[in-house]
Amino acid sequence: MQKVLVVGASGHIGRYAALAFKKRGWFVRVLVRDPEKLKRPGPFGEPLLEGVVDEIVTGDAAKPDTLFGIADGIDTVFSSMGLRSSKPGMSYHDIDYLGNANILQEVMLHDVQKFIYVSIFKADEMMEMQIVKAHEDFVQALKDSGIDYSILRPNAYFSDMLQFQKMATSGVIIWPGDGSLRINPIHGEDMGDICVDTAAPGHQEIDIGGPDIFTYKEMFTLAFTTIDKEPRIIFIPLWIVKGLHSFIKPLNARIADMLAFAIAVNEIDNTAPRYGERHMKDFFETFGGKNRTD
């Protein structure tokens, strides 16, 4: 039986990856800081993992002394671990790079055959952002390590799009640019299946999107219609957002990074190769009740 260690198993993709490996007959060990989180489903329908996976190990990737033996007997390591947003006293560099580097250092002490890592789509076009640089610093460390690897680059997840439905609930969506650029996000469960597929031998870097392509304007309209609201969308010219970014950058690095990301995704085509069978409209309709105000 093949054995996998899933790092970041309390997160959105980590949960789906752990479940997908288990369904394919793998022995699944998960590493988490707080095992209590695995006793309940995630906020976007992600599966609970207690009683599903074979072994739950408690450890903190930022503390190497808690990681001893985590990869003992493991064939493949999967990591989607990373900060969703920067926090006081903790940076993207600390977790997305150093945390994963600590995992890799421990992994190299064992006979692990493969390391699968979830990075960022079109990262080379957004390297000025802290979160992107941290991801790609680890990608380079992984490539330099000599271990077989797969680098997965999803463009976005369905759960990311719920922010637009929440905005729609307030009555208006405000967005940089003109809404003409395109994106095809993927459901976390479809992404989990791809994670298992890429455990096959051989170096791989894969761009990943979902089956349905939308312009941002079409995505916003769908966010409104699935909660029975009339679309109201305000687009802000990019030159205004860029000016705001230049003003904010020396004052607040976190907000500046958020603005930089908003600018970046409105200057590149975010469509990726199509995978999966689940659809954005169905996901919006499932969560629409939670975002509806009558």
What are the roles of these predicted feature ranges?
Residues 3-27, 31-32:
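N-terminal Rossmann NAD(P)H-binding glycine-rich loop of SDR-like oxidoreductase domains
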Residues 5, 36-102, 106-109, 124:
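NAD(P)H-binding glycine-rich loop region in Rossmannoid oxidoreductase-like domains
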Residues 83-169:
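Glycine-/Pro-rich loop/turn segments that contact NAD(P) or position catalytic residues
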Residues 99, 177-198, 204:
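Substrate-positioning beta->alpha
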Residues 159-166, 197-206, 229-231:
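Glycine/proline-rich active-site loop of Rossmann-fold NAD(P)-dependent oxidoreductases
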Residues 180-189, 208-226, 239-243, 278:
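Substrate-binding strand-loop-helix patch
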Residues 218-267:
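Terminal hydrophobic/aromatic helix or amphipathic segment near a protein terminus
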Residues 265-294:
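Amphipathic terminal alpha-helices
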